[in-house]
Structure formats: C-alpha cells, structure tokens
Amino acid sequence: MASNTVSAQGGSNRPVRDFSNIQDVAQFLLFDPIWNEQPGSIVPWKMNREQALAERYPELQTSEPSEDYSGPVESLELLPLEIKLDIMQYLSWEQISWCKHPWLWTRWYKDNVVRVSAITFEDFQREYAFPEKIQEIHFTDTRAEEIKAILETTPNVTRLVIRRIDDMNYNTHGDLGLDDLEFLTHLMVEDACGFTDFWAPSLTHLTIKNLDMHPRWFGPVMDGIKSMQSTLKYLYIFETYGVNKPFVQWCTDNIETFYCTNSYRYENVPRPIYVWVLFQEDEWHGYRVEDNKFHRRYMYSTILHKRDTDWVENNPLKTPAQVEMYKFLLRISQLNRDGTGYESDSDPENEHFDDESFSSGEEDSSDEDDPTWAPDSDDSDWETETEEEPSVAARILEKGKLTITNLMKSLGFKPKPKKIQSIDRYFCSLDSNYNSEDEDFEYDSDSEDDDSDSEDDC
C-alpha cells in the first residue's frame, strides 16, 4: 500500500493503494472500507480511485477515444471491457454474486457470449459498447419489451436463451422480434408461459421447457413450428402442458430429431419410457433418470450442474441390454452434487429410488418376470454381456471416460450410426463436442440377420 494520501470528498485524507498488482484492484473494489461511509450506503466513485487505477493502466489518462473505449474515464464503472475482465479473473463467482457494483455482476461477456439478468435496454447500452459483436445471449428475469429492444441492436446473434420472462402473458404472445434475427440458429425458451413467437428464418434447434400453455394457446406455437419445417432439424419439448397427439405425430413425421416428454395434461397421451443422461465435456454431472417402472419421481428437483442445461438424446428401453444400461445409470447417478465422487448408500438422496435393490446395490432380477420388459421379436440384433464378463460398471469406470460411445461399447451392443448423436452444449447439436473417434466406429450388429431398417433399434 502506498504511503501518500489524497484529499477525497469531505476533505478527509485517505490512503491510496498501489495498484501495480491487478489483484489489489479486485480486493480493493470488494473489501476496502472507504466504500461505505454509512452501513448499506455505496460511496460514489471518487477521483482518487481513478488515479490509483491509472497507475496500472496509464493509457486511461488519454482523452482521445480508443478503438475499444468511447471516451475518457469518468468512473470505474466505465472501464473498458478488457480491464473489467482483467480484474474479474481474481474474483470468485461467490464474490461477484453478492458484490453491489453492477458491472461486477454477471453483466460481462467473453468470447462474444453475454449473460444478463433483469437488465434494461439502457443498462445494456451502457454495458456493451459493441453489441454487433455479440453472438450468444442468455436472458434471465428480463421483461419482454427490454429483450425485444436489445435484440434490435444485436443482429448477429446466433444462439439465444430466454428464461423467466417477467411480463409475458397470453395476450402478448411473446413477440420479441425474432423474425429479424437472420443468423439465429439455436433458441431455448424456459419458464415463459404464453410465449408463442418461435419463428426465426434460420432456426435449426428449438428447445421449449415449462411453458404450461392452455391448448387454445398452443395453436400459434404449432403454426410457427410447422412454418419452420424446411429449416428446423431439432425440436425438444419438456414439461410444456398442452401438447396434443396430432402435433406430436406431425413432429415425429416431419422433424429430423424430435423429443417430447412430461408435456401431456389435457389428453391421455401415453408416456414412453426414457432414460435421461447429462454429459458435459465427457464428464458425468448427473441430471435425472425417469421411468414409469423403477421410480416415478425426479432424482433431483433442479439441474445439479450450475451451468446451462445440456440435453442428451433419449433411448427407449426395449431390449435387455438397454434395461441393463438403465440399471447402471441409476447406480452411477448417485454421484454427489458436484460430480466428483460417489455418495454412500445411506445418503438421503437414495430415498428417491422406489426399488430398494438399486439403493442397496443388489442386482434386481424382477425384470425377467415382468412382461413390460419382455424383449422385442428382433432382439437377435443385440449383443448382451454374459455372466462371466466383468460388470458393466467395472468396464465403464475402467475406461476412465464416461462417454456415450464407451457406454454403448461396454454394454455390449452397437446401435446404428444414424441413431448416435454427439452433444452440443445447451441444444444437442451435432456441430460441437463431437468425438472424432466415433466416426470410425462401426455401429452395427454382428448378427447376420440384422435388419438395418428396424425402427426398434436404439
């Protein structure tokens, strides 16, 4: 800390830190007592702080606007983005979350990705000087009118996540001006009841979760989705009540990859048995496994991993090998909440399992007597492990990586390539996080009677 002092507001002399180390800047912004002249009161930014920061960033003393900055420094809140990021790398997310200074919240972006919460258009203009560079935006708890105004200034957005729109209702239908976003390819809308305006000219991936629409409001959604038939390749609908059987049938026939679950309230649509798995960068983080037989409740009420949701394709349980995979996934899903190790069998989380044999680690042989799990007629196409072979869990964990490919290989059956998809963050795209080793792997059965056109194969 420097020994010199400067006169601040009120005429008192206060020490000025030596900001030759940027970490001192970060700690100063968070913990220096001179921020609070009274409890709960934030002192305005003072010139002594700007002068102190200038010791670290002398280029800020120029009054000429630079390429990345529109004017001289009037307050630390207007610091150029690269300096904000430089400071923030020394702060934990916990520190940022409770810090009272707006630009130290999550309103910052790196690699053209923006995450904002409850932001206004004016705040957005003040925070982001080059909105045309932004390619991905995540809105949370933001009013629809603010989102629409912001999107008008970000024409190059390709990915958009919208959660909990504050002022959405059944009368507005959620017109956010998406039809003007020429390059938008990925859209995820969650917890936005009444949102129906999904149409965008280049949209290929659409994820809808928890819209809870009455059937009479689902018509605009169906019309919008049907109008995107030529571009829309991936459609995922979760917990969106109001979906009807004709729409599900149309999507099944016309959308290349279509999944829908927990979305039937008003019609008695049978719910298929699905296995849900969440992978992130080849690591197991855990999501929920849902099934009509073994347990009917979600394993966890919320996403375990705090980053945005990653969706993985679902596999109907039709063959003994798939049932075995499900049992294995039930066991490994007992990982602790940060995904670093196994929970004990006595952990309260195991109360989520309806079948006691799973929580105790014992094998369940009840499937053999259950007609629900009877193998299909073409089960000769599937290879299953023998009793002499190592357990599925042992073979998976021995590999060190829990990927879809390793999982399928270790389970002893080989699905066809058109049914195996790589995982893209947030939207199940085929263009990211792809394991190149999969391209050379023959997803085919060794059986001579293999039916390549069978719809029952995984």
Curated annotation (Swiss-Prot):
Annotated region (Disordered), positions in chain: 339-397, 434-458
Protein name per UniProt: Uncharacterized protein 002R
Composition bias type Acidic residues, residue spans: 344-390, 436-458
Domain of life: Viruses
